Amino acid sequence: MKVTILASAILALINGALALPANTPTLDVTLTQVDNTRIKATVKNTGNEKVTFVHLNFFQDAAPVKKVSLFRNATEVEFTGIKRRLLTEGLSDDALTTLAPGATFEDEFDVASTADLTEGGTVTIRTDGFVPITTDRKVSGYIPYQSNELEIEVDAAKAAAVPQAIKLLDRRTKVASCSGSRASALSTALRNAASLANAAASAASSGSSTRFQEYFKTTSSSTRNTVAARFRAVASEASSQSSGKTTYYCTDPYGYCDSNTLAYTLPSSNLIANCDIYYSYLPALTSSCHAQDQATTTLHEFTHAPAVYSPGTDDYAYGYRASTALSASQALLNADTYALFANGTPPPPPSPLHIHFQMLDTNNGYSREP
């Protein structure tokens, strides 16, 4: 993994997955075609109670996030936008939407801005997942959502004319090495992420089956092997601070950080970026179960990158309650499920020799440990 910094600043969600009470609020999403690849989503609160939820990583988010999944001949079209990890408390008011019972809101977006649809032809669009609900600007639960399946015929020429939401960076300019306190913090986070991922890999492959079932909703050997393999791949990537398969920015190269975003990944470029609150808000390692910290945030972002382990994960759910309500197939591809499992898997104590070298290490840069 190369560490750099800018010099200037699915459809089966419900089937067999959930045992929700009949009166549980839900969001119904109706997708319609506006013009070619431009889509309108109408989101309705079908419950009997007012709900306040986080609309970031959802409809009404102005950033190029994954609002829907696109399929051509049953194969998902690669998403070229960003996937980001959000705060779970202290959220700003502009990150929240409140819907009364029966109320709706609409969001229009162009799917060709975050996917290559220049081939044209038939594309199927759908979405499902969970949206975090909040109390006093803190995530307190989740609300499920699901859409209709929309089939559109894409005009290839029109799709090609849609500007891409994210332009590739010119890596020849405005790029320098991490330095100072952020370099030190990220170096520590990478070491901790590698340690947590290694411990989680062992727990996934040969640890408690009850605990694995809690997070991944199955104890099948194939799933345990897949989860362990992804954790080992994350540990390997986090252990290499001067080379690797991803590029890690200490700050935001694209301008998609805000007061609610800890970090984000651009899977199509295997690029990860930390936001300001990654450093100011998160501890290096939390002592609380299922809480956020720098190490598990970095681990979460690594799971999104397909070059680390393919396919990269999605964000079907955030937090323990929502993540443990997923189906087995969704949990296997949910980034926060990996972060939560790793958070609850304490790494083995380091050997005395390792501690000795750490005490002697005064380098704040990115040279390898002895």
Curated annotation (Swiss-Prot):
Cofactor(s) listed: Zn(2+)
Keyword Glycosyltransferase found: no
Known EC number: 3.4.24.39
Cofactor binding: number and manner: Binds 1 zinc ion per subunit.
MF terms in GO: metal ion binding; metalloendopeptidase activity
Disulfide bonds: C178-C250, C257-C275
Signal peptide range in chain numbering: 1-19
Binding residue positions for Zn(2+): H300, H304, D315
Catalytic reaction list: Preferential cleavage of bonds with hydrophobic residues in P1'. Also 3-Asn-|-Gln-4 and 8-Gly-|-Ser-9 bonds in insulin B chain
Main location: secreted
UniProt record similarity statement: Belongs to the peptidase M35 family.
PANTHER family per UniProt: NEUTRAL PROTEASE 2-RELATED (PTHR37016:SF3), PTHR37016
Protein name: Neutral protease 2 homolog AFUA_4G13750
